[in-house]
């Protein structure tokens, strides 16, 4: 099925998974003192449309967790709730053991501490599908903007770091270019450098390759693989099953706002138990 079993067998996490500390009891994750992100019983609705119906997920330090599933399954909403770009209606959220505090009505809550929100957002850097670079700024200025403006860091120090991160993603020669002068793959790599320049605890990728053609997609995939090999904590929403198999310590399959199946890549892709997951993998294989 999908011939991913051979693929995942090559990778480090099947020899010794860094996700061994992710424990399951009665279908629920046990909290770990190594965790960066912990979510319990998360619910999110838009009016009468319930998008997340009670999701539990944990990402421990150094783990790469991929969220897969059909469009509309709740993957991107879950990621945006992690970063507090969306407010959930119910459930517990913790960042490095610190519980998010809420105010407001039960089904219309919001975080109560703006400083806590800023602290969490700056430590959970998002990489968006559509890059979201400022068109009027150079690539270097885009990467420097948040650390200087939001974190009030010294501009000269930030510039040195920004140039280093642009070199890291192989576009160090594009510092003075504007987004419109770059290919889609280069823009996404600039967005990754921007996220890294915040020095976050974790990176959150929302479909980082879906807006790219296959050739440009591989440029971004290489960067993500390199980051995974460094042991960075990452949550990745993706339709790219090969990417998920390559880099993940743990894969979560969502269906209609619930976790349908989860496990290490070898199990999820090689021995799926859910009929929905088997169908999803087969469909993804047919498309690719």
Question: Which stretches of residues belong to each language-model region?
Answer:
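A short, surface-exposed alpha-helical micro-motif characterized by mixed small hydrophobic
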Residues: 244-246
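Catalytic Walker B motif of ABC-type/P-loop ATPase nucleotide-binding domains
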Residues: 203-206
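Conserved signature/switch motifs of ABC ATPase nucleotide-binding domains
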Residues: 177-180, 198, 230
